[in-house]
């Protein structure tokens, strides 16, 4: 059942943590709580979220992504976990399977940011796609599993004064959501400044 928006510009976010061990209670999931905290700091426009904690099973991941976009009506879906080279890491495969348009720039930029910190970022296979239905479209992105890496990829890199050195991927998300017919997203610039061409800016 589609979620009811409390405001025309309310962003519906789906957060999916993908982990065999966290989903069975072996350890506590850190990905979704980290994302909740980040959005609370980063967004100034209205939003609500739907969360899922599921195992590394491709069919389950695909079903969950489809449910969040097609049934719930999410505009943005973020996953954490399952993007490495191990046999059980199938999040990118599931994401590509449900997408109608690949968005390779997001994964490329995530790896560029993470390579500033660890050489093993090369092993990460994060992807992003647009999923389109006749009446709706959403952006789906894979993120790292660690809270520190999640923040780095979303916000990018800043110098000591807080000036952006390398843009984070979320800077491009609001305009992407505009282009696919979603709500107008506004951010806290000190956390992550949304970029739009002048023609796409809303007059306040």
Labelled PLM ranges:
Residues 1-204:
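Non-catalytic beta/alpha edge segments that cap or flank active sites
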């Amino acid at each position: 059942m589609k979620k009811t928006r409390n405001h025309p510009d309310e962003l519906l976010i789906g957060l999916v943590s993908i982990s065999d061990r966290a989903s069975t209670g072996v350890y506590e999931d850190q990905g979704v709580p980290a994302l909740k905290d980040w959005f609370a700091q980063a967004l100034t426009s209205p939003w609500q979220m739907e969360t899922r904690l599921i195992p590394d099973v491709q069919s389950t991941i695909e079903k969950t992504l489809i449910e969040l976009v097609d049934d719930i009506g999410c505009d943005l879906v973020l996953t954490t976990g399952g993007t490495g080279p191990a046999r059980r890491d199938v999040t990118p495969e599931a994401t590509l399977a449900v997408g109608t348009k690949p968005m390779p720039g997001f994964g490329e930029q995530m790896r560029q940011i993470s390579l500033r910190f660890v050489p093993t970022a090369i092993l990460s296979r994060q992807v992003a796609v647009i999923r389109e239905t006749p009446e709706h479209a959403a952006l789906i992105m894979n993120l790292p599993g660690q809270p520190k890496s999640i923040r780095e990829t979303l916000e990018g890199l800043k110098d000591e004064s807080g000036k952006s050195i390398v843009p984070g991927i979320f800077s491009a998300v609001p305009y992407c959501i505009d282009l696919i017919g979603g709500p107008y997203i506004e951010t806290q610039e000190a956390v992550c400044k949304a970029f739009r061409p002048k023609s796409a800016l809303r007059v306040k």
